[in-house]
Amino acid sequence: MKVCVVGAGAIGGVLAFRLATAGHDVSVIARGAHRTAIASRGLTLVDHQDDQRTATQPMQAVEDPTSLGPQDVVFIGLKAHAIPELLPRVATLVGPTTMLVPAINGVPWWYFQREGSVHDGLVVHSVDPAGTMHAMVASSSIIGCVVHAAAEVREPGVVHHTGGKGFIVGEIDRSLPDPRTARIERLAAALRDARLDATVSSDIRKDVWSKLIGNLSFNPVAALTYAHMGRICGSEALLDVIRPMLREGLAVASAYGIEIGMTPDQRIDVARYLGAARISMHQDFEAHRKPEIDAIVTAVIELAGRVDVPVPITRMVEALVRERAISDGLLSA
């Protein structure tokens, strides 16, 4: 397949490397020193898991998506706040049969497209400030994706795959008689051939929330404390903040028809397995990058307000982490 990965950073880099290794025609959209390194030397993956090895794959790396033309699959590995500006150019990669797969954190902009409830078509302004993203690409091309993997870019052109290989993919159109379409099975098979653990979801929005409630609580707390996951899960004082945020997230999900089927303490037990891992917002603050507060936290507060679900602890923590980001020069006031 002809594959383009838009944003070949941490997760995008893992996807690009493994799909290229599996024989697909892969190109990447990147910027700056990272793009220069990939274009000149190839993309290097340092695997900290099964292989315990380092390898390099040559691939085309460009800054402008419009130079590549339509693809079979386009993965978006950007931070959520970077997507609105770039999406019009990403749209040039999408042909009539292209699968557009946003492998992103937080509430995705497509969440209420073809959602099939009274909320169908709702715009989440925390992730789509101008309310125009739904018109930039056809919703029929979008495949939902939830990533359960950890990676970091530690130097230009080099991605460290530090944990997990889980990629859940699913159709976003709830009117389909069978969500296991031929194209979704083809995509999952390609990911498996690339030695990733791909599963097909019959309800991708439930999978979005299953990950989101953890990110909603652990990410801002990690960013405020610089504590890794093991330390957070071992601190009853921090868990006294995490638990009510988990309860609030579960309540918002339920108000939109999603029942996760997991208690806060069960979700904390899942997080314990991450050990000394530094969660994404923690990494962003340490690297002095703009954090995904809007997509991961503010969007949930926005959705809570629309259905009158109180989220006082989430609001308080969001205010704290936002002010920390402003003070550090990562966000504007």
Label the model's feature ranges.
Residues 1, 72, 165:
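Nucleotide donor/acceptor-binding cores
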Residues 2, 25, 197, 259, ...:
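Residue-level detector of anion-binding/catalytic polar loops
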Residues 231, 239-333:
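NAD(P)-dependent Rossmann-like dehydrogenase/reductase catalytic/cofactor-binding core
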Residues 1-51:
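NAD(P)+-binding Rossmann beta1-loop-alpha1 motif at the extreme N-terminus of oxidoreductases
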Residues 93, 134-211, 217, 223-261:
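Internal alpha-helical scaffold of NAD(P)-dependent oxidoreductase catalytic cores
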Residues 44-47, 117-120, 159-163, 216-217, ...:
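Short, hinge-like loop/turn segments at secondary-structure boundaries
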Residues 54-154:
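Rossmann-like NAD(P)(H) cofactor-binding subdomain of soluble oxidoreductases
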